[in-house]
UniProtKB/Swiss-Prot annotation:
Together with its co-chaperonin GroES, plays an essential role in assisting protein folding. The GroEL-GroES system forms a nano-cage that allows encapsulation of the non-native substrate proteins and provides a physical environment optimized to promote and accelerate protein folding. The gene is groEL. HAMAP family: CH60. ATP binds at T29, L30, G31, P32, D86, G87, T88, T89, T90, G413, N477, A478, A479, D493. It catalyses: ATP + H2O + a folded polypeptide = ADP + phosphate + an unfolded polypeptide. The lineage of its organism: Bacteria, Bacillati, Actinomycetota, Actinomycetes, Bifidobacteriales. It comes from the Bacteria. Forms a cylinder of 14 subunits composed of two heptameric rings stacked back-to-back. Interacts with the co-chaperonin GroES. It is an enzyme of class 5 (isomerase). GO terms for cellular component: cytoplasm. GO terms for biological process: protein refolding. SUPFAM superfamilies: GroEL apical domain-like, GroEL equatorial domain-like, GroEL-intermediate domain like. This is Chaperonin GroEL. It comes from Scardovia inopinata.
Length: 538
């Protein structure tokens, strides 16, 4: 494909147009009085949202240079969302303000490289101050307050606080559709995975169509169970104790399945067979998780273990196992706490090292099943559009609350940035264009607070001047229009969200200012209209 190239000021202005189009669309959503944006969809109903990254993803501009500028800002929103789960609009507003301030100085003759260094040094200093100003999350009410701000709904904030209080920081909170109106919260006790019994003949509770095993043996194998001889040997081991048996295997088929079913029907011994969850290496890892949780040993060819020669030391134990058509829950596994803690530490390390969002999500689920638990928030609404929008807001609020637990809280409403910058400005000692770069940050840092004020119907400049005279931690509560102690009022932002927004915005601003040429794809001319078909004249 042919390329077109622009240089210097012309290149930067082309990109700036795209940045402004995207940022001006996104920033109307900022703050408690922010507006919604309607996103048209090729198929299905339109989406109504106030989530910055969702809006940014939908914007695709026609001009190639504007498109490149918009894509750079999309990266700011996406990266902030990936790291913190919120703060995408704040990051976009900061990036726009930093770029405008910076380009003004580049046009006036400042050195872009020195400006970039100044921006980075000032941003790093402000981030350090934000971290030192952080207040740890100590109460359920603090979690509820920060989740309420993110979701814009007190009921959602309370449900998320209850969920995280129950499952812990390592637990997983998932959001699902509900077939009735409103919010419901459900908790999973023990380790649950999405595989049910292989045969309905294993059911012990006909009313609920579940199989419940009390104090069972648990046999885990990475291979298939197909041979009748294997089942006979396993049955001999189990029948001595009189305990029920759960078999988790790649599959149970051949002669093995009818043998198990026949023994169950005759009452010889109570057993349930289920397929192991996952595929490939992930299946092996999940089986090992189960083994550690229950004190079992995975029967595997790799370890030289065969089903026809095992003894009862390979069995795991749990207080109860509940198996339905679609899922299995292991309650109170008998594994060593030390072994479980070591496995949890290993999975945490894998999460930190992983660069794949999908892998991190799956590892987090495994971690929750071992260390925490799983809470499910079920969302129902009057229309599909409303349910989809509410579900998305709740997912963001969950990540926001977890970010608060991780690094602590700051006063919200853009105040923490303004006050941290004022403290840092007194101590930053830079010269020349680096000092100019730092000044760009100290001016641009006001943009989120100004935008929140404007969206709430106040003058941004007046609010900034007022906040500068207030004690640390006090500012405008845009929801009520009052100036007050924001931490006490429950108007907070997670440190992780605020610092990620600033760091990512500063990074993209530096790239903008140091761009000297832009190479874009040349737009293809529209295809000529098809010639009329003479046979269509009838």
């Amino acid at each position: 494909m042919a390329k077109i190239i622009k240089y210097d000021e012309e290149a930067r202005q082309g990109m700036l147009e795209g940045l402004d189009e995207l940022a001006n669309t996104v920033k109307v959503t900022l703050g408690p009085r922010g507006r919604n944006v309607v996103l048209d969809k090729t198929y299905g109903a339109p989406t109504i949202t106030n989530d910055g990254v969702s809006i940014a993803k939908e914007i695709d501009l026609e001009d190639p240079y504007a498109r490149i500028g918009a894509e750079l800002v999309k990266e700011v929103a996406k990266k902030t969302d990936d790291v913190a789960g919120d703060g995408t609009t704040t990051a976009t507003v900061l990036a726009q303000s930093l770029v405008h301030e910076g380009l003004r100085n580049v046009t006036a003759g400042s050195n872009p490289i020195a400006l970039r260094r100044g921006i980075e040094k000032a941003s790093d200093a402000i981030v350090e101050r934000l971290l030192s100003n952080a207040k740890p999350v100590e109460t359920k009410e603090q979690i509820a307050a920060t989740a309420t701000i993110s979701a814009g709904d007190p009921e959602v904030g309370d449900k998320i606080a209850e969920a995280l209080d129950k499952v812990g920081q390592d637990g997983v909170v998932t959001v699902e559709d509900n077939n009735k109106f409103g919010l419901d919260l459900e908790f999973t006790e023990g380790m649950r995975f999405d595989k049910g019994y292989i045969s309905p003949y294993f059911v012990t509770n006909a009313d609920e169509q579940t199989a419940v095993l009390e104090d069972p043996y648990i046999l885990l194998t990475s291979g298939k169970v197909s041979s009748q001889q294997d089942i006979v040997h396993i049955a001999e081991l189990v029948m001595k104790s009189g305990k029920p048996l759960l078999i988790v295997a790649e599959d149970v088929d051949g002669e093995a399945l009818p043998t198990l079913v026949l023994n169950k029907i005759r009452g010889t011994f109570n057993t349930v067979a289920v397929k192991a969850p996952g595929f490939g290496d992930r299946r092996k890892a999940m089986l090992q998780d189960m083994a550690i949780l229950t004190g079992a040993q995975v029967v595997s060819d790799e370890l030289g273990l065969k089903l026809d020669s095992i003894d009862d030391t390979v069995f795991g134990h749990a207080s109860k196992v509940i198996v339905s058509k679609d899922e299995t829950t292991i309650v109170s596994g008998a594994g060593s706490k030390e072994d479980v803690a070591a496995r949890v530490a290993q999975i945490r390390s894998e999460i930190e090292d992983s660069d794949s969002d999908y892998d991190r999500e799956k590892l987090q689920e495994r971690l929750a099943k071992l260390a925490g638990g799983v809470a499910v928030i079920k969302v129902g609404a009057a229309t599909e559009v409303e349910a989809k929008e509410r579900k998305h807001r709740i997912e963001d609020a969950v990540r926001n609350a977890k970010a608060a637990i991780e690094e602590g809280l700051l006063p919200g409403g853009g105040v923490a940035l303004v006050q941290a910058a004022a403290d840092v400005q007194k101590n930053v000692k830079l010269e020349g264009d680096e000092a100019t770069g730092a000044g760009i940050v100290f001016r641009a840092i006001e943009a989120p607070l100004k935008q929140i004020a404007q969206n709430a119907g106040f003058s941004g400049e007046v609010v900034i001047d007022k906040v500068r005279t207030l004690p640390a931690g006090s500012g405008l509560n845009a929801a009520t229009g009052e100036y007050e102690d924001l931490l006490s009022a429950g108007v907070t932002d997670p440190v992780k969200v605020t610092r990620s927004a600033l760091q990512n915005a500063a990074s993209i601003a530096g790239l903008f200012l140091t761009t000297e040429a832009v190479v874009a794809n040349k737009p293809e001319p529209p295809a000529p209209a098809a010639a009329p078909n003479p046979d269509m004249g009838y």
